[in-house]
């Protein structure tokens, strides 16, 4: 777990999850670690800890996972991404991407402030609070740091 993370009540974070610096995990969030959960093997004998391979959820720096969301391992959540409350994440989430729903789908882009960005041109977005400009390059949002 990185520095300055905030983990809210009732969150369940299973190893080998990794949290970057400044991550927010909302109340009741679940980060899973078993891609193919079963109580028994094909012979109906109880699975042992050696009978499965853990896979984790990796949450990038500054990202937020909203209340009651479930992230199904293995997934990577990019830096500064925002997962809307109650979402079920089954795929990787890009940096600054906003996803919502079940399954979680692209719903826009957010900036460092966590606010949805306003489109100001075909490939540019602006934060309504900080006025920072972000650019869409090859399907990924980038911040140039010029503001």
Predicted regions and their residues:
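Structural signal for interior beta-strand "rungs" in well-ordered beta-sheet cores
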Residues: 1-42, 46-106
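Intrinsically disordered, low-complexity terminal tails/loops enriched in metal-binding residues
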Residues: 61, 123-124
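Short, intrinsically disordered, charge-biased short linear motifs at domain edges
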Residues: 95-101, 110-119
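Cys/His-enriched microdomains
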Residues: 106-109, 125
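Short cysteine-rich clusters marking metal-coordination/redox-active sites
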Residues: 111, 127-130
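Short, non-ligating residues that shape and space the ligands of small metal-coordination modules
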Residues: 119-121, 133-137
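Hydrophobic residues embedded in beta-strands of well-ordered beta-sheets
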Residues: 124-125, 140-142
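Glycine-rich phosphate/pyrophosphate-binding loop
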Residues: 144-147
């Amino acid at each position: 777990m990185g520095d300055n993370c905030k983990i809210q009540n009732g969150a369940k974070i299973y190893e080998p999850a990794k949290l970057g610096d400044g991550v927010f995990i909302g109340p009741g969030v679940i980060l899973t670690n078993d891609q193919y959960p079963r109580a028994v093997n094909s012979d109906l004998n109880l699975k042992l800890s050696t009978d499965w391979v853990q896979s984790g959820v990796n949450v990038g720096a500054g990202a937020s996972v909203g209340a009651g969301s479930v992230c199904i391992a293995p997934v990577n959540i990019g830096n500064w991404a925002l997962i809307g409350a109650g979402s079920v994440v089954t795929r990787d989430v890009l940096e600054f991407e906003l996803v919502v729903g079940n399954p979680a789908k692209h719903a826009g882009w957010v900036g460092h402030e966590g606010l949805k960005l306003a489109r100001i041109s075909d490939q540019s977005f602006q934060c309504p609070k900080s006025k920072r400009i972000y650019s869409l390059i090859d399907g990924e949002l980038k911040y140039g740091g010029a503001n």
